[in-house]
């Protein structure tokens, strides 16, 4: 609540200042014909929308408890808010770019540059205040939320209740949510007797809320996972991603204010306009009065020329520079938030090296259906099928596998153990718990049917192979011929009296 309260106060303060100043800039830009100020006012409008989105995302992201409709809570709300803010900012950049191109074709003279200068300085002060409020969100901090689930256990939330350690070898531990001690350990809430996969007991009257008065049964393979104390003090990277979008909006607005101030100063000191009562010609754009300059000169009347012309092109040029800077700073935010929502493998995870280390674990015969994705921020989740030799040694193998995932920064893992059946070979049947044939197309990476002969008395199950595992097998083994890749179809001929031969697939 403390972090939410601080961010909420900053966002509300910046929202009020931004909205009031946006209205002021729109009025002044129309009166003075300043493109830079008009662009900055549009940017202010985008900032208002960004701050509203950030407030909503920040509020929803506090609801980290699991529900029957959302087993991960609203952790990804801030990632979605960051993506929306990045899209807003990108669209705003293109709108400013089109307006700048129009000003290159038809330049306009700025009216009342001192007024523009005053408003620009005031806007710069507001944006500097915003940068001071959100400067600690300009980068990312590392966060590690641990959660493990091996075998038949489900996922817990990244931040579960603190539980008290018991004697070694104890499997079931009852802990009241309010208990705390100096030797506390943090782990996920894993409850075996509930329908919620995240292990939270739900109130029958209100399924959306967990029951706070019940004791929580925690069972993690007989051992509690010890977490470092500094994990609770670190701020979640998902919130950093959302607030970074706000910071980029404020930074872009500050750049716009700087452009307004510079353009107003240059125009005030360099531009020589026409005074009232004097005949003046502006050579910077077509003027029908130019045709009469020679006639007027023959009468020895004084003719003045406005200029220099480059001052009129400074405004759109600086706007183009601002657009380039904003796009350069927004692209990483847009890319990162989109990749998180697309559930791609985090860039800091070397998936091939991870598979290699898992296969090198003693007691592991095969690794397949390995999937790694990023839930939000630094909360990385992994699932895998691990084939082991002996069920009795699985617990030791699971601890080693857990350490391998920890070393790669993956702290929320679900391992499906598979034990080799008698006479089976890992290279022939990589998955002992294959999916049914009718659900093959609904898996993450599809299925590959296993060829079998007609002599087999039992049906051979469909073999499920992940895309990465299939690519690794193709790299290690020589390519098969086209005929060998075709699944074998078995036709059984039954000799029935007075009946035609019957075939079955």
UniProtKB/Swiss-Prot annotation:
Residues the record lists as Phosphoserine modifications: 504
Residues exposed to the Cytoplasmic side: 1-10, 57-80, 135-246, 328-505
Binding positions (Zn(2+)): 43, 47, 249, 253
Record localization: Cell membrane; Basolateral cell membrane; Cytoplasmic vesicle membrane; Cytoplasm
Keywords for this protein: Antiport, Cell membrane, Cytoplasm, Cytoplasmic vesicle, Endoplasmic reticulum, Glycoprotein, Golgi apparatus, Ion transport, Membrane, Metal-binding, Nucleus, Phosphoprotein, Repeat, Transmembrane, Transmembrane helix, Transport, Zinc, Zinc transport
One Gene Ontology cellular component annotation held by this UniProt entry: Golgi membrane
Stretch list, region Disordered: 142-215
Pfam families: Cation_efflux (PF01545)
A single MF term (Gene Ontology): calcium channel inhibitor activity
Superkingdom of the source species: Eukaryota
InterPro entries on file: Cation_efflux, Cation_efflux_CTD_sf, Cation_efflux_TMD_sf
Transmembrane annotation, as ranges: 11-31, 36-56, 81-101, 114-134, 247-267, 307-327
Extracellular side of membrane: 32-35, 102-113, 268-306
GO biological process: defense response to bacterium; detoxification of zinc ion; intracellular zinc ion homeostasis; zinc export across plasma membrane; zinc ion import into organelle
UniProt feature, compositional bias: Basic and acidic residues: 203-214
Listed Gene3D superfamilies: Cation efflux protein transmembrane domain
Glycan attachment points: 297
Membrane topology of this protein: Multi-pass membrane protein
Polar residues composition-biased segments: 187-199
Catalyzed reaction equations: Zn(2+)(in) + 2 H(+)(out) = Zn(2+)(out) + 2 H(+)(in)
Quaternary structure (record): Homodimer. Interacts with TMEM163. Interacts and forms a complex with TMC6 and TMC8; the interaction regulates zinc transport into the ER.
Function: Zinc ion:proton antiporter that could function at the plasma membrane mediating zinc efflux from cells against its electrochemical gradient protecting them from intracellular zinc accumulation and toxicity. Alternatively, could prevent the transport to the plasma membrane of CACNB2, the L-type calcium channels regulatory subunit, through a yet to be defined mechanism. By modulating the expression of these channels at the plasma membrane, could prevent calcium and zinc influx into cells. By the same mechanism, could also prevent L-type calcium channels-mediated heavy metal influx into cells.
Recorded family membership: Belongs to the cation diffusion facilitator (CDF) transporter (TC 2.A.4) family. SLC30A subfamily.
Name recorded for this polypeptide: Proton-coupled zinc antiporter SLC30A1
């Amino acid at each position: 609540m403390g972090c939410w309260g601080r961010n909420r106060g900053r966002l509300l303060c910046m929202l009020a200042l931004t909205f009031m100043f946006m209205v002021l800039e729109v009025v002044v830009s129309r009166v003075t014909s300043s493109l830079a100020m008009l662009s900055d006012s549009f940017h202010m409008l985008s900032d208002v929308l960004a701050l509203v989105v950030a407030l909503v995302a920040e509020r929803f992201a506090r609801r980290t408890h699991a529900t029957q409709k959302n087993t991960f809570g609203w952790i990804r709300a801030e990632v979605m808010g960051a993506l929306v803010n990045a899209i807003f900012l990108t669209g705003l950049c293109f709108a400013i770019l089109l307006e700048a191109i129009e000003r290159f074709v038809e330049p306009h003279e700025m009216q009342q540059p001192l007024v523009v200068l005053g408003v620009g300085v005031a806007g710069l002060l507001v944006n500097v205040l915003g940068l001071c409020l959100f400067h600690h969100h300009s980068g990312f901090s590392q966060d590690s939320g641990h959660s493990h689930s091996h075998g038949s256990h489900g996922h817990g939330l990244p931040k579960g209740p603190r539980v008290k350690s018991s004697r070694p070898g104890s499997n079931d531990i009852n802990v009241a949510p309010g208990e705390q001690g100096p030797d506390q350990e943090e782990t996920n809430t894993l409850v075996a007797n509930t329908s919620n996969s995240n292990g939270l007991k739900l109130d029958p009257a209100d399924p959306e809320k967990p029951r706070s008065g019940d004791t929580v049964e925690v069972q993690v393979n007989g051992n509690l996972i010890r977490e470092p104390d500094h994990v609770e003090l670190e701020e979640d990277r998902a919130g950093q991603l959302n607030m970074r979008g706000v910071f980029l909006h404020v930074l872009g607005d500050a750049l716009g204010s700087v452009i307004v101030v510079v353009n107003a100063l240059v125009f005030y000191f360099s531009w020589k306009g026409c005074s009232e009562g004097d005949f003046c010609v502006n050579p910077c754009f077509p003027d029908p009065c130019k045709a009469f300059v020679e006639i007027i000169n023959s009468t020895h009347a004084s003719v003045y020329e406005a200029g220099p012309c480059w001052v009129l092109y400074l405004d759109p040029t600086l706007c183009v520079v601002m657009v380039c800077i904003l796009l350069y700073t927004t692209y990483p935010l847009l890319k990162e938030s989109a990749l998180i929502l697309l559930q791609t493998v985090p860039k800091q995870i070397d998936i091939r090296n991870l598979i290699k280390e898992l296969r090198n674990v003693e007691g592991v015969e095969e690794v397949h259906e390995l999937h790694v994705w990023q839930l939000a921020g630094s909360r990385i989740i992994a699932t895998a099928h691990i084939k082991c030799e002996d069920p009795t040694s699985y617990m030791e193998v699971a601890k080693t596998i857990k350490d391998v995932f920890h070393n790669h920064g993956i702290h929320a893992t679900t391992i499906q153990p598979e034990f080799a059946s008698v006479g089976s070979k890992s290279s022939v049947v990589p998955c002992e718990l294959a999916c049914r044939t009718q659900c093959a197309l609904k898996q993450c990476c599809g299925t590959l049917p296993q060829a079998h002969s007609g002599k087999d008395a039992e049906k051979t199950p469909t073999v499920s192979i992940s895309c990465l595992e299939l690519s690794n097998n193709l790299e290690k083994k020589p390519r098969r011929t086209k005929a060998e890749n075709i699944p074998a179809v078995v036709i059984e001929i039954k000799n029935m009296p007075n009946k035609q031969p019957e075939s079955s697939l």
